[in-house]
Curated annotation (Swiss-Prot):
This is Threonine aspartase 1. The keyword Protease applies. Its EC number is 3.4.25.-. Keywords: Autocatalytic cleavage, Disease variant, Hydrolase, Protease, Threonine protease, Zymogen. Changing D233A: 0.1% enzymatic activity; no intramolecular processing. It comes from the Eukaryota. The gene is TASP1. InterPro entries: Ntn_hydrolases_N, Peptidase_T2, Taspase1. Intramolecular proteolysis generates 2 subunits, alpha and beta, which reassemble through a non-covalent association to form the fully active enzyme. Belongs to the Ntn-hydrolase family. Residues 1-23 are annotated as: Disordered. GO terms for biological process: positive regulation of DNA-templated transcription; protein maturation; proteolysis.
Amino acid sequence: MTMEKGMSSGEGLPSRSSQVSAGKITAKELETKQSYKEKRGGFVLVHAGAGYHSESKAKEYKHVCKRACQKAIEKLQAGALATDAVTAALVELEDSPFTNAGMGSNLNLLGEIECDASIMDGKSLNFGAVGALSGIKNPVSVANRLLCEGQKGKLSAGRIPPCFLVGEGAYRWAVDHGIPSCPPNIMTTRFSLAAFKRNKRKLELAERVDTDFMQLKKRRQSSEKENDSGTLDTVGAVVVDHEGNVAAAVSSGGLALKHPGRVGQAALYGCGCWAENTGAHNPYSTAVSTSGCGEHLVRTILARECSHALQAEDAHQALLETMQNKFISSPFLASEDGVLGGVIVLRSCRCSAEPDSSQNKQTLLVEFLWSHTTESMCVGYMSAQDGKAKTHISRLPPGAVAGQSVAIEGGVCRLESPVN
């Protein structure tokens, strides 16, 4: 087992306003001061997938992660809910043609796009998800709307509101609730169509020569590198707002050439994402979003496993042990040659301000980590105090074998927190 602990630190203390000299304050200065005070804090960590990210497309992956972070922080600064902020980040990731989510998603065996997405609110513990959804540009928006509608209580005649919808039913529900549809030709990009044609030809050739399943599997894995297109790049984000509320979301187009109707981890409870505020039995608020081979993540319920593990004192060690013992060495995946997946996690807790600080304020201590068994994982992160987002493509160390090795990195930051 190979482990990497290159701490890409995001330590950033809240900036302090400079002292104002005595004298008159203009109306413009007063307005500026008021708008500054009205801005809320928070932190976001996003990923553009665990899979294979070529050097040639590194710039595009990092750029979309930066934009996603900025969208989430803008929401948090405006006082939006953590769920709305994490949704804003995911919408930006879904709209990129370089990610396997929303627009440009992998095509299934019939050449169609079917998307999965889910979101969880750490404060209410409510959850919303869609699976095998076609015709909607941003599946995470439907998942978030399901979550919001579910919080309103029972429907007419005492009916229980749905939290998870699939296929045509999910599409009709979205349209009925004002979410616009999107024609298939808009959702499909030239990149996804070209990849579909290449993969389809290889599949047809394999079937003609009666290639067995294992040979076909190896062909598919190698084609990811040859075509410069990772098929496991589910996208996701985790957020904590200035009050310490957390949220997590995930979105995916699924595996290339998947069977129509297949639903992956991105739509399933405890598998794609998890968020849970601090409580009587939880000293930390935690948020998790996963990526990788959906079937592997489903059978290990990895998102929830990681969240529970993060209640330990040492977050880094807890996540490493979870990836090793609950994922790579999981008895539920004993028949797999390589276990492919990745996670981004954050945990937060309230604590006193820095010891050398003269201000009697509480802060939110936010620890954030990412870990993967795939060859690479692209992440971005940003706090409300940062001028811009930081991005990074994490890779397994030289000589490490994907599916059998673990890379883990992360950092820490402090956010001002209102005292309750």
